[in-house]
Amino acid sequence: MATGGRRGAAAAPLLVAVAALLLGAAGHLYPGEVCPGMDIRNNLTRLHELENCSVIEGHLQILLMFKTRPEDFRDLSFPKLIMITDYLLLFRVYGLESLKDLFPNLTVIRGSRLFFNYALVIFEMVHLKELGLYNLMNITRGSVRIEKNNELCYLATIDWSRILDSVEDNYIVLNKDDNEECGDICPGTAKGKTNCPATVINGQFVERCWTHSHCQKVCPTICKSHGCTAEGLCCHSECLGNCSQPDDPTKCVACRNFYLDGRCVETCPPPYYHFQDWRCVNFSFCQDLHHKCKNSRRQGCHQYVIHNNKCIPECPSGYTMNSSNLLCTPCLGPCPKVCHLLEGEKTIDSVTSAQELRGCTVINGSLIINIRGGNNLAAELEANLGLIEEISGYLKIRRSYALVSLSFFRKLRLIRGETLEIGNYSFYALDNQNLRQLWDWSKHNLTITQGKLFFHYNPKLCLSEIHKMEEVSGTKGRQERNDIALKTNGDQASCENELLKFSYIRTSFDKILLRWEPYWPPDFRDLLGFMLFYKEAPYQNVTEFDGQDACGSNSWTVVDIDPPLRSNDPKSQNHPGWLMRGLKPWTQYAIFVKTLVTFSDERRTYGAKSDIIYVQTDATNPSVPLDPISVSNSSSQIILKWKPPSDPNGNITHYLVFWERQAEDSELFELDYCLKGLKLPSRTWSPPFESEDSQKHNQSEYEDSAGECCSCPKTDSQILKELEESSFRKTFEDYLHNVVFVPRKTSSGTGAEDPRPSRKRRSLGDVGNVTVAVPTVAAFPNTSSTSVPTSPEEHRPFEKVVNKESLVISGLRHFTGYRIELQACNQDTPEERCSVAAYVSARTMPEAKADDIVGPVTHEIFENNVVHLMWQEPKEPNGLIVLYEVSYRRYGDEELHLCVSRKHFALERGCRLRGLSPGNYSVRIRATSLAGNGSWTEPTYFYVTDYLDVPSNIAKIIIGPLIFVFLFSVVIGSIYLFLRKRQPDGPLGPLYASSNPEYLSASDVFPCSVYVPDEWEVSREKITLLRELGQGSFGMVYEGNARDIIKGEAETRVAVKTVNESASLRERIEFLNEASVMKGFTCHHVVRLLGVVSKGQPTLVVMELMAHGDLKSYLRSLRPEAENNPGRPPPTLQEMIQMAAEIADGMAYLNAKKFVHRDLAARNCMVAHDFTVKIGDFGMTRDIYETDYYRKGGKGLLPVRWMAPESLKDGVFTTSSDMWSFGVVLWEITSLAEQPYQGLSNEQVLKFVMDGGYLDQPDNCPERVTDLMRMCWQFNPKMRPTFLEIVNLLKDDLHPSFPEVSFFHSEENKAPESEELEMEFEDMENVPLDRSSHCQREEAGGRDGGSSLGFKRSYEEHIPYTHMNGGKKNGRILTLPRSNPS
């Protein structure tokens, strides 16, 4: 912080002088002064220096004002400021709420020098509510970083692409705008007007503004960055930002290239030079800057030079300055970097001060080293001072307690001594308590031209080291008697050393045992012990003082060793020694030992020290091979790849690979996979290599032992992205804090977790190759509890020695699992020198025809039309055969399928077909193994004779049915009479009912009554057909006119549904049945029935005309690339909310009418002329969108992509299952009617949803709609909301007309009476939803095998769904006949 302040203070006088020179040249283009860069902090005092500034030549930093309040800024405004040449930084300025008054005319930020790649930084401005830089038109270089501003809004309304050339590197996060809490209102919006220009970003066509009162200025595209006038006319090509007149370079607000004498120019003509990348100056201007800096000798100023037609602060790399003309000339060889020291000397008292001399080769002045502490000093000093080759003055080392050696001056070769310390000293060393070495004189050469040496009070620096320096530096004989103190230098060091020799060395893989010769000083009591030093040394170039300083930084490991017991007999004297433990295998260590002795009375210190020796530990077992990956490229081969061990612990010579075939689980033989609901087992072979990390499985979640969903570790890409994001933020903050004050310590955290949810499934499939490290075993244990019996030869392990990191294993059985063991070895013979094993499982690919049935299919025909089919099993299938599929058909009929389990096949040696009708049959069979289906056999033909041909059966055939018909008639008549008495006909007469007639086929309707015309009947003459609209379920749908069909309207546009002329009676009844269902519906958000024409042919049903067709087609037409796009943009959030509420209101009405839709989808919703969405007429769309349906087994078509899990699994349809479908409709609205679960087949969707899956969030989906979807897709039906609750959630954001027409706000929407809730189940009315006669109801209720499809509806619909902790009480049970294929 202090450093930055000093630099700014030093540079200010020079730049103020520059500003004065430019005042006359500024002209009208810049109305004020050119000011130097400013750092304004702590208070507002210096802010007034901006008052007359038009250009800030440098940066503007406003920061660290914690006591300012909003009223302090109200009278502050600097309208003259137009351009900042570097960057603008605002950081922790309290009370500042907007910049609109502070810098109302700031137009350009050039970004010549950036703040961490950013030209505009707004960081931790706690009170800033808006930027307000409404005249900012151009940021020439750099990006924008706006972060951690808790009150900052109006960010989404700024189109940064109009200000910057590229917005990809912008970083705008963690502001109030991120939380969607901002109510950004552009000028005119509150009054319903559009005053500001609108642009498209990320598909959003939005107005652009800086504040509620200032629009963002958007120039025509052809103007590019030149700007435009207030009328929108383009400025001159040399302008930047704005201008007052078009096509005039003297009327620009700022210049695109350079400014010269009141006009903008492309380049500076001679004799002018480019200065600061924006203006032109002459030679005298640049020369004045050079001389003023040189003469002032102030820190932080620059001695400007001329290079490439530019006036720049210093010569670039590879050039040096010619002092006569200030020109930069190329260097001959390496360029010296001369650093001129202010006041002739510089004191290095910290790493920070040393950094200021980084890169210097010549010091023009004297250096004083006075370092008393610090971290990692030796390395830091070498990095910053290691290139210094020459010092013109003197070198003084004073009270530097942290220094052990001067070897960090690794290139210092000359001390000139042009300036000497008092007493004529050019090298001065005083009171350095830990200095032990000057330089390694065997490798270093130093010359001192003038001056003497001074050494006093360096207690650990031996005199021999000083005398060696005298000889090398050429100063011997210059010193006087008292210049080198004999008593205070080296008085605490072992300077008269003897050489210790090692007598015994023994190694193992993690230990080294050392012994050395005994040593005793003249007084043996002076020996305190030995010090053993060792460290890893890949190369034999280590010196004793490498990396050492006196503050604890030491690259050596030091061990203190007590002296041995002294013996009077030298021959029996024990040799001291030490066992070094915990070493790394196969690693070279540098080792030396020296004595630790006391200070002697004779001022002489004795001691001994060994030379540095190098010892390597032995090899041992390597660590496990890394990342083994297996793939199968054929049915008989597996490719194995791996990486070398992380710790080879020796030279890896080879790898051992073992593999063994794994038996399939015999339990698979015992199960009957033809049973409904039993999942077919499957196995997959090892997939091809995708990357080196393909063995890692990046599932989003897994199930634990209790079957509960657990979060999985994040994928490598997620972790890498989070680490990069965290590192990026930390690096920026460190950079910011380094510039602003002091660098903070790096946090030990791993970074913030991503709060966004990353998973969409509640369950997980099987996992593929998994690698684990286990101890080596001689034979592989069998992992299956029970196995298919196979010969021991097939399962014997195989072994192979490999000399590289890959292997192709051949000769394997097709589609068979193998377990592979991999060991790394670093020696040829002993087995114990190999690593523990890494295991990987793999499976070969299936054989193409291995599952084909061998030989012909034979048959045998028995009585009662039973046929026994027989065939042979595949000889060598892919894994196991789990079932057989038999496909047979009678000539002229549909093909039928029969599943035969393996257990059943083993008993029958085939299967039996029973109850066959007479005729010619063909049959095909295929086997299903763990790998999938085999091929069908060739068809086999047989003939079943007519059962009537047997005379003895004629009587049974005739008499039996007669008895059955008689009994059946009696039962039906009794039931009919009973129900007739208990329940009179409804007001609409007999009724065929269906909860969704689309899935009730004609075969389910017993036609014992006909349609009876009523008040809905319309005369055929009143209907006029105009044009075809499309094909419906029963026939064509037309647009037409109807006269007098609605009271008060002479003629009404309607939709007319017809039935095909070839339709059967049952189809016509079903057609009218649909119309009858619609008669009971009178809701604005449900398509209305207007009338029926049942007299004559064809039958017509007249409906309300929905001008924009079905919702699915309408949404697709809104896609930008759609050919039939009506010119409307995609729906906004407000329009999505309106659609959702209208659909929910219609469904709430149907629910109140005890109607379960069962096929709610966008295709079944219709769009009216005023864009109101209504629930469709339940019959127009299934044939049109037939691909949206799926036939499951022998059932009718099912819309599986819209169905709830309980409907798919158990056939249960309730209002809760309709709510699930409503969530899918919301998904269709936000995705513009994409197909749900795109890329999955219907069978995959079926399994995915039943297993707990649901749809991903569409791109750019509003968070509010996403929340609604998730509410609808609760796996537990009881936890889903009701449609009334949905409308209640959205009611405050709907069109004002909604309450006038909605069911939600109507009198009809009332809670049921309390006595109705007390009904017992026996007393409840069984209400089928198909309008049918009573006889049809009775038959449906008593039909054999007619499994009913039940659903519940709660009367407690006004209780929020989040409180439904138990089952729904007092529910009404309604039974329906199961739908059959239509």
Curated annotation (Swiss-Prot):
Changing C462A: Does not affect S-nitrosylation. The modification S-nitrosocysteine is found at C1083. One of its GO terms (molecular function) is insulin binding. Isoform Long and isoform Short are predominantly expressed in tissue targets of insulin metabolic effects: liver, adipose tissue and skeletal muscle but are also expressed in the peripheral nerve, kidney, pulmonary alveoli, pancreatic acini, placenta vascular endothelium, fibroblasts, monocytes, granulocytes, erythrocytes and skin. Isoform Short is preferentially expressed in fetal cells such as fetal fibroblasts, muscle, liver and kidney. Residues 733-741 are annotated as: Insulin-binding. The modification Phosphotyrosine is found at Y401, Y992, Y999, Y1011, Y1185, Y1189, Y1190, Y1355, Y1361. Changing C228R: In a gastric adenocarcinoma sample; somatic mutation. SUPFAM superfamilies: Fibronectin type III, Growth factor receptor domain, L domain-like, Protein kinase-like (PK-like). GO terms for biological process: adrenal gland development; amyloid-beta clearance; cellular response to growth factor stimulus; cellular response to insulin stimulus; dendritic spine maintenance; epidermis development; exocrine pancreas development; G protein-coupled receptor signaling pathway. Changing C1083A: Reduced S-nitrosylation by BLVRB, leading to increased receptor tyrosine kinase activity. Keywords: ATP-binding, Carbohydrate metabolism, Cell membrane, Cleavage on pair of basic residues, Diabetes mellitus, Disease variant, Disulfide bond, Endosome, Glycoprotein, Isopeptide bond, Kinase, Lysosome, Membrane, Nucleotide-binding, Phosphoprotein, Receptor, Repeat, S-nitrosylation, Signal, Transferase, Transmembrane, Transmembrane helix, Tyrosine-protein kinase, Ubl conjugation. Residues 1-27 form the signal peptide. Changing I56T: In LEPRCH; abolishes post-translational processing. Changing Y1189F: Reduced interaction with GRB7. Changing F409V: In IRAN type A. It comes from the Eukaryota. Changing N996A: Abolishes interaction with IRS1 and significantly reduces interaction with SHC1. Has no effect on interaction with PIK3R1. GO terms for cellular component: axon; caveola; dendrite membrane; endosome membrane; external side of plasma membrane; extracellular exosome; insulin receptor complex; late endosome. The active site is at D1159. Residues 1023-1298 form the Protein kinase domain. Residues 980-1382 are cytoplasmic. Belongs to the protein kinase superfamily. Tyr protein kinase family. Insulin receptor subfamily. Tetramer of 2 alpha and 2 beta chains linked by disulfide bonds. The alpha chains carry the insulin-binding regions, while the beta chains carry the kinase domain. Forms a hybrid receptor with IGF1R, the hybrid is a tetramer consisting of 1 alpha chain and 1 beta chain of INSR and 1 alpha chain and 1 beta chain of IGF1R. Interacts with SORBS1 but dissociates from it following insulin stimulation. Binds SH2B2. Activated form of INSR interacts (via Tyr-999) with the PTB/PID domains of IRS1 and SHC1. It is linked to Rabson-Mendenhall syndrome: Severe insulin resistance syndrome characterized by insulin-resistant diabetes mellitus with pineal hyperplasia and somatic abnormalities. Typical features include coarse, senile-appearing facies, dental and skin abnormalities, abdominal distension, and phallic enlargement. Inheritance is autosomal recessive. This is Insulin receptor. It comes from Homo sapiens (Human). The lineage of its organism: Eukaryota, Metazoa, Chordata, Craniata, Vertebrata. The gene is INSR.
